[in-house]
């Protein structure tokens, strides 16, 4: 083991786990530990043969002889010291102290011990394997009986020796021992003649037994088993034993093959019973137990391991440095708990040796056996040890080996899956409005520490008079002013990763270019707040420095903040302006008319010759920001406007002209927002006029012409008559950002740009337009002229700039370009081209901040405007409540009905007051508060109602119990007396008190919700972590039919067909009504095609789906469709499983725990929403919250619905009768019974299909799978999950939910193994099952049969093919035990197992990605292989790039790195999970 090094770790292809036999332990061991001592109390040196012995575990000082203390050189490693006679005797090997982390020892146990995990975990593996049945009876030996046996509390009959009174495998307990032994001795006595010696001995023993059994001592302490065991064994072949020796005998004599055959025959019997009686639940349980037993027996057969390996003969002692003993100040020592547990074992083992030597009585030895067993149990798993764990002096349970593996603080999750990171730091964040999207402000002291090696390199290379690493280090530590220019130089071209915990989705870690700032806080770009969910009220963020060239390239290309504009969960821009910026833009785009606002509007109708003239007039207050003016159309700086040539002048406000300058020349001109009136049909079929807000732009010729005027018109007159545009709100700005993204996001690859740059020189600089025009976009179409112009402009500008630099640098007349110059040009062009959208966002940000400042928006109490009708509405409510009270007093309504009516009335009154106040917003458009919530900057109308109207109903903290939901009780979770005051008028003492309930409940809900949501994300990541995009096309012909997702209760659309098909591939060609092809099979449905499909009235579309993808352990590009974060087809290597988990988990916090109800019956409808329901679906609960739905079992029709009374209390039930046809054509009926009063979803004569709801409620997924097929279950889960999120206003793409559903239905329970290698009762992955079935059918053999099983998110990771991934999730001991008995091999296919081993994950840049795809991040020099490289001129061979660059300093910089790596300074943790302790 000591030879195991990092090189080997990199090459590991698979890992196998199996049981360690006695020989294995001895081979690992470097010596036996025989003494419980640790170190000498005087010399502090390890004791010989103790737990820290240097001869066994290695020296405590490098290359020092542990016996004579001689120091050796490194070159003497692995030699033997023979300096002294003692050295010659013990032959100590000279080793480095590092081996103390890998050299093991062992303790030879005098009596074998049963491994605790194998009889305690997973309902006792030993019990399942042995499956002991008591001879001549139907009784079996339970795992509890076996446990008593292991702890020497009872004995077992191993062989009956022909005695009828001793049944083989019978457990002899202390309570009935006397009777059993007496009967056995009686029977044995009859075998001998009366006067023989044997007869005498047995008679004597029998008499002694009878007299002792009735005595007080016998009744108190029981009989001495050993004495009678010996007598019985001596005179017959019967064998009775106890403890580990009995288990050893049983394991040695088990016939595994016979046992497997017996279990299979038992299962066959039960299956025959099932054919006659399909609903026998007791038999189902019995079969399930047999399946589990068969799995264990088969595991030992297939792995070929000896079951006796579950006993411990020699106990391994883990390496000394993994259980350290640390010296504290004051001469005290602190030690790992494991040492204390080992000490107890050694002390007891040594005491047993003494008893053996002195031939002590068997009872004393038995007690010692038991104590050793318990001591080893405590070492292995102290927390599970019964009755109580072993505690330390201060009564704390000691941490055993299991505890160091499991849970959040265990080895897997703390050290293997999350590590502390060098080159990192953390600080508070403050806003940096002056930063660009791709920049972060790093405090310069922090940068000096983070980039220390690079800075030292610059200092040594520069003219700083610092010429050694030590001097450089000192200058940095003292923050010598000389270093700052070199710090600037060192961070050039570097990127840093920024992370904010909790890391809920991939945008919680992004890359930025560092900018040095003074101060101690990190400066964050304000638009980056949304993806990080950060604010500036004291949040902290961590910075990490990627070191290698590949890491920097990956961070820059894939993680740079300016490239992550779209959110992965819905494909919409996640970087949207908000708050101050929105307020500024709203103010900037407001329009005012002189006729209405009078003097406030200066200069309306004026004409300016140029944009600059207009700006000058605005700055000199000759024209106001909101005044409409005219400019020549040439001055607005827009290309390709479609308008009549005679209209030369354009009308807008000064603010809009300024606003439009933020966008590129080829982007449309935005005029503002108009309200249009359109006819809309409502749910009842009535046509009503409804308002629709439309942003007018120059893209629409009709809209543009409204704002254009010909030469010679009276501008002032025309403008005065024109209607006012509305200002832009948050939603409008978000739509504009989306349009900017769609138009200007990069549509060519880096290699395309490189191919253009490769062809240019000074003579061909004019042909760049033609070269760019030849490029194709990601869909293989010629690129848009806007992109050609942008690329041409950037390349020409940068080419000229670099040429000039070369001329200055080389002092030549003509620039001589080298590969480095081409690379530099490519990097700059690529950055500028991919940064256009971010630039526009930065422009918008700057405008927003500037004009929100200029607007001078403030709020005061006078801004809170009230409505005169509020008081009368509240009075009307009081009157109505009085009326309800009268009705109740007269017995006309129940108290629950009165309560519900009260709640409903107050909710309606609050809604009316809100409508009244909304009307006021139109009358006072300049009111600061109204501006804030009309623009979407902060707050909304319901906040304003609390300020100016009434606070309304308050929640209290009444808990809704499961029983309430099942019995449909009205739960009074709302205080029925509302808070009638507003904040403006002030609350009364009672109202203030009433408000505290809701506020407190809100805070506790949020805290609980965050923890639960984090745990959900963790479970989902474990479910889907291995799923990546693996190939182009899996070739499936099996599609997934989608239509609008409807809420059948309210008949409203939850998710429209358009949203479900856009960005997916078709499975079959789609034609319109006239048979014209809209889109062919296997084509991507673009937004345009999706619109056409919907407009043609097509209601159902068959698409390619993850749910029908044939790619094992992943998906193919066609079945997945579009990568929402890039808005183009997904790339091979994308870790879509993790993205899916994050997209579902991240908004989990927003799914409220409490159930929104403002009245109405607090029944199932209210309660089934929210987070609880999501957990129910994803964990596939068998008893969901509330009453489960009643579903149809067959195809047929409803023939009768009637109400009946039953039982002594005359409980009313509804009985629904369905008629259906059996397979042989007979007509049968089936009755569904439910408590009266529940909502029935069918009528008489309705046709029903299996799985259709007959009575309202949540459907139990297992029941749905039983009556329907997997497609039915898939559709139901998808619909329910989408309903939960969409009702809360959260958009999540279907494909993410599909990935999780696919995993939930990915296992098949084998019911008939056919000719396959599977065995009955095993759970097999669906892809493995299909592959094996196909193979057997092709060979003409019998394929296996099975049924799909639905598994919840809690169980799926535990069923993973990788035991490493499963063990690091939950239930670690159970996973390791089951894997070890199978001798399971982990082939390292998923992400987690590779992280555990320190390998690169098999995704992204380490996958078989396609050329020029997202993950093809090659060295930019490779694009210019034919160009002159000055770095290679003195080198004969083309070396690795690291060897080429900085030849003279490479060794030096490597030395700096090595020194730093060993120091591991300023370490930090990237937190990948939430802070909940799950």
From Swiss-Prot:
Its EC number is 2.7.7.6. Mg(2+) binds at residues 535, 537, 539. It catalyses: RNA(n) + a ribonucleoside 5'-triphosphate = RNA(n+1) + diphosphate. GO terms for molecular function: DNA binding; DNA-directed RNA polymerase activity; magnesium ion binding; zinc ion binding. Keywords: DNA-directed RNA polymerase, Magnesium, Metal-binding, Nucleotidyltransferase, Transcription, Transferase, Zinc. Its cofactor is Mg(2+); Zn(2+). Binds 1 Mg(2+) ion per subunit. GO terms for cellular component: DNA-directed RNA polymerase complex. The keyword Zinc-finger does not apply. One of its GO terms (biological process) is DNA-templated transcription. The keyword Zinc applies. DNA-dependent RNA polymerase catalyzes the transcription of DNA into RNA using the four ribonucleoside triphosphates as substrates. HAMAP family: RNApol_bact_RpoC. The RNAP catalytic core consists of 2 alpha, 1 beta, 1 beta' and 1 omega subunit. When a sigma factor is associated with the core the holoenzyme is formed, which can initiate transcription. This is DNA-directed RNA polymerase subunit beta'. The lineage of its organism: Bacteria, Bacillati, Mycoplasmatota, Mycoplasmoidales, Metamycoplasmataceae.
């Amino acid at each position: 083991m000591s030879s195991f090094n990092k090189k080997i770790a990199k090459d590991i292809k698979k890992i196998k786990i199996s049981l360690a036999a006695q020989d294995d332990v001895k081979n690992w061991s470097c010596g036996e530990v025989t003494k419980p001592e640790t170190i000498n109390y005087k010399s502090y040196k390890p004791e010989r043969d103790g737990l820290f012995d240097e001869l066994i575990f290695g020296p405590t000082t490098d290359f020092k002889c542990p016996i004579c203390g001689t120091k050796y050189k490194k070159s003497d490693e692995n030699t033997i010291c023979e300096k002294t006679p003692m050295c010659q005797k013990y032959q100590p090997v000279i080793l480095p102290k590092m081996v103390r982390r890998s050299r093991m020892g062992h303790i030879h146990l005098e009596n074998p011990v049963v491994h605790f995990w194998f009889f305690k975990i997973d309902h006792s593996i030993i019990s399942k394997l042995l499956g002991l049945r008591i001879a001549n009876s139907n009784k079996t030996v339970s795992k509890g009986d076996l446990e008593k046996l292991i702890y020497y509390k009872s004995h077992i009959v191993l062989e009956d020796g022909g005695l009828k009174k001793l049944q083989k495998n019978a457990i002899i307990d202390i309570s009935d021992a006397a009777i059993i032994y007496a009967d056995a001795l009686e029977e044995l006595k009859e075998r001998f003649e009366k006067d023989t010696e044997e007869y005498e001995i047995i008679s004597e023993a029998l008499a002694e037994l009878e007299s002792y059994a009735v005595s007080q001592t016998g009744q108190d302490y029981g009989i001495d088993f050993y004495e009678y065991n010996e007598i019985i064994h001596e005179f017959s072949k019967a064998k009775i034993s106890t403890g580990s020796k009995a288990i050893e005998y049983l394991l040695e004599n088990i016939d595994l093959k016979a046992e497997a055959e017996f279990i299979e025959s038992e299962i066959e019997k039960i299956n025959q019973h099932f054919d006659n009686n399909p609903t026998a639940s007791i038999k189902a349980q019995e079969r399930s137990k047999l399946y589990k037993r068969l799995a264990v027996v088969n595991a030992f057969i297939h792995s070929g391991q000896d079951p006796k390996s579950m006993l411990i003969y020699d106990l391994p002692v883990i390496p000394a440095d993994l259980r350290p003993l640390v010296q504290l100040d004051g001469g005290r020592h602190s030690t790992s708990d494991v040492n204390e547990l080992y000490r107890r074992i050694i002390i007891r083992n040594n005491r047993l040796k003494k008893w053996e030597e002195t031939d002590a009585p068997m009872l004393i030895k038995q007690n010692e056996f038991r104590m050793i067993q318990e001591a080893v149990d405590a070492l292995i798993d102290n927390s599970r040890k019964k009755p109580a764990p072993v505690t330390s002096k201060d009564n704390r349970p000691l941490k055993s080996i299991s505890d160091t593996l499991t849970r959040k603080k265990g080895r897997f999750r703390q050290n293997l899956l999350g590590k502390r990171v060098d080159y990192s730091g953390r600080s508070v964040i403050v806003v940096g409005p002056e930063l660009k999207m791709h920049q972060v402000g790093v405090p310069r002291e922090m940068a000096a520490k983070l980039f220390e090696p690079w800075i030292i390199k610059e200092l040594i290379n520069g003219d700083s008079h610092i010429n050694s690493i030590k001097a450089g280090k000192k200058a940095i530590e003292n923050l010598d002013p000389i270093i700052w220019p070199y710090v600037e130089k060192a961070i050039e071209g570097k990127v840093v990763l920024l992370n904010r915990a909790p890391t809920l989705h991939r945008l919680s870690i992004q890359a930025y270019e560092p900018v040095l700032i003074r101060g101690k806080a990190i400066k964050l770009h304000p638009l980056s707040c949304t993806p990080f969910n950060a604010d500036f009220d004291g949040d902290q963020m961590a910075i990490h420095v990627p070191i290698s060239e590949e890491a920097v390239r990956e961070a820059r290309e894939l993680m740079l903040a300016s490239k992550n504009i779209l959110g992965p969960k819905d494909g919409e821009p996640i970087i949207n302006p908000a708050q101050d910026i929105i307020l500024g833009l709203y103010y900037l785009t407001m329009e005012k008319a002189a006729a209405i606002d009078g003097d406030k509007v200066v200069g309306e109708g004026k004409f300016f010759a140029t944009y600059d003239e207009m700006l000058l007039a605005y700055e000199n207050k000759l024209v106001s920001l909101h005044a409409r003016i005219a400019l020549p159309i040439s001055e607005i700086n827009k290309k390709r406007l479609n308008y009549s040539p005679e209209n030369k002048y354009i009308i807008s406000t000064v603010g809009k002209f300024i606003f439009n300058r933020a966008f590129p020349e080829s982007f449309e001109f935005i005029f503002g927002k108009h309200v249009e009136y359109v006819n809309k049909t409502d749910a009842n079929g009535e046509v009503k006029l409804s308002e629709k807000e439309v942003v007018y732009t120059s893209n629409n010729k009709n809209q543009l012409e409204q704002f254009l005027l010909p030469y010679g018109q009276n501008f002032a007159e025309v403008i005065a008559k024109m209607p006012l545009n509305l200002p832009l709100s948050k939603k409008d700005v978000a739509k504009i950002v989306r349009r900017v993204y769609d138009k200007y996001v990069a549509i060519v690859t880096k290699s395309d740009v490189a191919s253009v740059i490769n062809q240019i020189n000074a003579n061909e600089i004019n042909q760049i337009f033609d070269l760019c025009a030849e490029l194709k976009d990601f869909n293989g179409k010629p690129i848009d002229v806007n992109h050609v112009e942008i690329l041409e402009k950037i390349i020409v500008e940068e080419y000229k700039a670099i040429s000039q630099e070369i001329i200055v640098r080389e002092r030549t007349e003509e620039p001589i370009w080298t590969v480095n110059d081409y690379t530099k040009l490519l990097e700059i062009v690529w950055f500028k081209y991919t940064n256009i959208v971010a630039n526009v966002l930065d422009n918008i940000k700057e405008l927003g901040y500037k004009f929100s400042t200029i607007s001078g928006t403030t709020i005061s109490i006078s801004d809170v405007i009230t409505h005169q009708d509020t008081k009368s509405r509240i009075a009307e409510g009081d009157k109505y409540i009085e009326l309800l009270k009268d009705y109740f007093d007269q017995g006309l309504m129940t108290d629950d009905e009165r309560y519900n009516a009260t709640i409903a009335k107050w909710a309606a009154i609050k809604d009316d007051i809100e409508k009244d106040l909304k009307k006021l917003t139109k009358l006072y458009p300049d009111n600061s508060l109204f501006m804030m919530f009309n623009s979407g900057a902060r707050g909304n109308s319901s906040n304003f109602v609390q300020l100016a109207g009434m606070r309304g109903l308050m929640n209290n903290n009444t808990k809704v119990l499961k029983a309430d939901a099942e019995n449909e009780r009205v739960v009074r979770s709302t205080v029925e007396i509302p808070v009638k005051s507003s904040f403006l008028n002030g609350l009364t003492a009672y109202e203030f008190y009433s408000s505290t309930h809701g506020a407190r409940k809100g805070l506790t809900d949020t805290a609980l919700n965050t923890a639960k949501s984090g745990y959900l994300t963790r479970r989902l990541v474990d479910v889907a972590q291995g799923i990546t995009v693996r190939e182009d096309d899996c070739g499936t012909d099996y599609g997934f039919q989608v239509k609008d997702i409807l809420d059948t209760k309210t008949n409203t659309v939850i998710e429209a067909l358009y949203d479900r098909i856009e960005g997916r591939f078709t499975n079959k060609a789609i034609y319109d009504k006239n048979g014209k092809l809209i889109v062919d099979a296997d084509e991507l449905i673009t937004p345009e095609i999706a619109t056409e499909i919907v407009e043609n009235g097509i209601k159902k579309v068959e698409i390619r789906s993850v749910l029908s993808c044939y790619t094992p352990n992943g998906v193919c590009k066609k079945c997945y469709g579009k990568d929402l974060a890039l808005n183009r087809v997904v790339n091979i290597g994308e870790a879509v499983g993790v993205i899916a988990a994050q997209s579902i988990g991240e908004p989990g916090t927003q799914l409220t725990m409490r159930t929104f109800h403002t009245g109405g019956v607090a029944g199932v409808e209210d309660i089934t929403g929210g987070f609880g329901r999501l957990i129910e679906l994803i964990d596939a609960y068998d008893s969901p919250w509330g009453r489960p739905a009643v579903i149809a079992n067959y195809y047929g029709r409803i023939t009768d619905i009637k109400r009946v009374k039953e039982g002594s209390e005359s409980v009313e039930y509804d009985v629904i009768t369905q008629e259906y046809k059996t397979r042989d054509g007979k007509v049968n009926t089936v009755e569904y019974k439910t408590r009266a009063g529940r909502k029935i979803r069918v009528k008489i004569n309705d046709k029903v299909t299996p799985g259709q709801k007959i009575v309202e409620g949540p459907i139990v997924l297992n029941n749905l799978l039983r009556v329907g097929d997997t497609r039915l279950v898939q559709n139901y889960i998808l619909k329910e999950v989408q309903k939960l999120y969409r009702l809360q206003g959260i958009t999540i793409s279907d494909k993410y939910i599909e990935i999780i559903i696919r995993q939930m239905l990915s296992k098949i329970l084998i019911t008939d193994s056919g000719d396959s290698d599977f065995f009955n009762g095993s759970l097999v992955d669906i892809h493995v099952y299909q592959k094996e079935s196909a193979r057997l059918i092709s060979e003409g053999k019998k394929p296996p049969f099975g049924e799909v099983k639905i598994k919840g998110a809690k169980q799926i990771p535990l069923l993973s093919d990788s035991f490493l991934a499963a063990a690091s999730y939950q239930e670690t001991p159970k996973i390791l035990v089951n894997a070890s008995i199978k001798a399971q091999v982990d082939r390292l296919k998923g992400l987690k197992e590779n992280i555990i081993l320190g390998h690169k994950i098999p995704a992204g840049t380490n996958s078989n990605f396609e050329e020029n795809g997202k993950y093809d991040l090659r060295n930019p020099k490779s694009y210019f292989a034919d160009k002159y490289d000055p770095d290679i001129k003195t080198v004969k061979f083309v070396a690795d790039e690291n060897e080429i660059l900085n030849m003279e300093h490479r060794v030096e910089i490597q030395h700096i790195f090595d020194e730093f790596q060993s120091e591991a300074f300023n370490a930090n943790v990237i937190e990948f999970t939430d802070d909940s302790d799950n």
